[in-house]
């Protein structure tokens, strides 16, 4: 009898525990994979941000360093590996830190969307003013605070410099005149300025 007692084993219980662990293991790995992918997407969004916008992101220094390094790398494979590293660094963030980053990115995207729409409106208005004299009357009706004499002078000079093939000085000043008369927020103002300068440089 004592020998039979010694042979009593508990492996079946251990196996059952292992089976339970395995039962939860697969969804846990899938969830981890999804979370890692989401963090890499978030990291890619950080890497793609304009430099000034990146400075406003609430990041710990370790993540900021990893993102800056990814921006610096031009080799495709090297950048891919660095982006994976950015994702791993982001796994060390707390939920609150990750949420703060997402909120800041969403806010930045909203600013960019509004600024882009604003830029397109200014450009369309400039085209209309240069193409049709009646467009100035309509613009002044909607924006009575605008300086009509300055607007007329800029339109006349922009048309003349285009005909003569000169650098688009007044063309750019007309952009600023429309933007000022139309009114805009500081964030949109800076973004429209940057985008407007880029477009004008292309046109030049």
UniProtKB/Swiss-Prot annotation:
GO MF annotation list: ribosome binding; rRNA binding
First-listed, main subcellular location of the protein, grouped into a coarse class: cytoplasm
Coiled-coil portions: none
Keywords: Cytoplasm, Ribosome biogenesis, RNA-binding, rRNA-binding
Localization terms from the record: Cytoplasm
Signal peptide, first to last residue: none
Disulfide bonds: none
GO cellular component annotations of the record: cytosol
Acidic residues: compositionally biased ranges: 187-204
Basic and acidic residues bias locations: 23-34
Entry's family note: Belongs to the DarP family.
Protein name: Dual-action ribosomal maturation protein DarP
Naturally occurring in which organism (per UniProt): Burkholderia lata (strain ATCC 17760 / DSM 23089 / LMG 22485 / NCIMB 9086 / R18194 / 383)
Gene name tied to this protein: darP
């Amino acid at each position: 009898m004592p020998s039979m007692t010694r042979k009593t084993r508990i492996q079946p219980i251990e196996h059952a525990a292992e089976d339970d662990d395995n039962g939860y293991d697969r969804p846990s790995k899938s969830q981890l994979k999804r979370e890692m992918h989401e963090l890499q997407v978030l990291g890619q969004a950080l890497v793609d941000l304009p430099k000034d916008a990146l400075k406003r992101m609430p990041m710990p220094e370790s993540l900021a360093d990893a993102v800056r390094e990814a921006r610096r790398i031009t080799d495709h494979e090297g950048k891919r590996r660095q982006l994976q590293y950015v994702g791993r660094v982001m796994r060390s963030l707390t939920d609150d830190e990750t949420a703060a980053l997402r909120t800041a990115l969403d806010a930045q995207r909203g600013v960019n969307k509004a600024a882009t729409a604003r830029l397109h409106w200014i450009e369309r208005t400039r085209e209309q003013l240069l193409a049709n004299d009646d467009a100035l009357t309509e613009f002044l009706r909607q924006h009575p605070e605008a300086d009509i004499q300055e607007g007329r002078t800029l339109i006349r000079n922009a048309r003349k410099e285009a005909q003569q093939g000169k650098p688009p000085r007044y063309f750019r000043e007309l952009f600023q005149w429309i933007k000022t008369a139309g009114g805009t927020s500081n964030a949109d103002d800076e973004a429209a300025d940057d985008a407007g300068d880029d477009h004008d440089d292309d046109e030049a």
